[in-house]
């Protein structure tokens, strides 16, 4: 008996949005010959408009950084950022239009959450670029784990050996750490890199910085991330934005040490440009 949640993929669906499917899904539907031809056209040749469900709306250049604005079929736009490094190019992809999380330092959620991006819309942020990238980071607009199924599907498509064949160790998901999804990613056989946007060492402070994560226990989030690291033998990154007067005290340093000392963890301390949250913290550039 077929699972009630099973989606029957048709040739019409593939023709209308081919970037949303793996080689196996396409092959099962249209046969090996057509599947190989289509995958070659999608991932080995110059991008063709007839296969695209989005387009480059604008490009902003700034030194080693290039920001793309992509216009989606429904008229909404998302941003994708390319960063040149000594060892290649990193692309930072979006997973949502808007964001439901509401981090006080981030503009992505200023207009609230509008919708999730499809697997195809995530994949096209990589394939339509002018740059050839060797690292993909899921940390643009949106919280990747609140669009879990589409994000995981996009990774399977990007890793497909018959397509882009992107290496797993070149993929990183940055998340604020919803517990259910952290448990799910632990059981996936993807072995991707993981970054936890922590930004606090106690519940009260994290609830201020990430107000829409109030229902998630900070200690359990840390435990889950460390469990992922141990299970997959992967170094995880802890992103910690230093906000003067809010999360930069000696007690914060000590708590970070208690959690992560002798663990397979990289703590990435980030400096914030104060003005936008000066009112919240009582800090100004003159302090």
Where do the PLM segments sit?
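Canonical Radical SAM [4Fe-4S] cluster-binding loop centered on the CxxxCxxC motif
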Residues: 84-120, 128
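Residue-level structural signal for beta-strand termini and adjacent loop
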Residues: 82-83, 150
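Auxiliary Fe-S-binding modules of radical SAM enzymes
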Residues: 1-76, 84, 226-234, 242-287
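Cys/His-clustered metal-coordination modules, chiefly Zn-binding fingers
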Residues: 124
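Short linear Ser/Thr-Pro motifs
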Residues: 59-61, 94-95, 108, 174, ...
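Conserved AdoMet/S-adenosylmethionine-binding subsite of the radical SAM
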Residues: 131-135, 140-286
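A generic beta-sheet turn/junction motif
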Residues: 73, 84-86, 177, 189
């Amino acid at each position: 008996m077929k699972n009630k949640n099973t989606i029957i993929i048709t040739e019409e669906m593939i023709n209308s949005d081919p970037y949303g499917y793996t080689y196996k899904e396409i092959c099962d539907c249209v046969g090996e010959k057509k599947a190989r031809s289509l995958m070659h056209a999608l991932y080995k040749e110059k991008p063709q408009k007839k296969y695209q469900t989005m387009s480059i709306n604008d490009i902003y250049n700034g030194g080693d950084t290039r920001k793309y604005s992509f216009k989606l079929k429904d008229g909404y736009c998302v941003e994708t950022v390319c960063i040149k490094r000594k060892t290649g190019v990193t692309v930072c992809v979006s997973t949502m239009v808007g964001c439901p999380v509401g981090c006080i330092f981030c503009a992505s959620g200023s207009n609230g959450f509008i919708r999730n991006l499809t697997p195809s819309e995530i994949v096209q942020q990589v394939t339509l670029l002018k740059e050839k990238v060797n690292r993909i980071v899921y940390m643009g607009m949106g919280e990747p784990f609140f669009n879990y199924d589409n994000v995981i599907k996009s990774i399977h498509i990007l890793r497909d050996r018959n397509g882009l064949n992107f290496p797993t160790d070149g993929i990183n998901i940055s998340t604020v750490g919803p517990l259910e999804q952290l448990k799910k990613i632990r059981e996936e056989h993807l072995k991707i890199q993981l970054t936890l946007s922590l930004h606090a060492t106690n519940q009260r402070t994290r609830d201020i910085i990430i107000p829409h994560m109030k229902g998630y226990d900070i200690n359990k989030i840390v435990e889950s991330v460390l469990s992922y690291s141990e299970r997959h033998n992967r170094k995880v990154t802890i992103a910690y934005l230093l906000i003067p007067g809010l999360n930069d005290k000696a007690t914060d340093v000590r708590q970070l040490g208690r959690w992560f000392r002798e663990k397979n963890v990289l703590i990435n301390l980030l400096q914030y440009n104060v003005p936008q949250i000066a009112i919240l913290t009582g800090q100004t550039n003159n302090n």
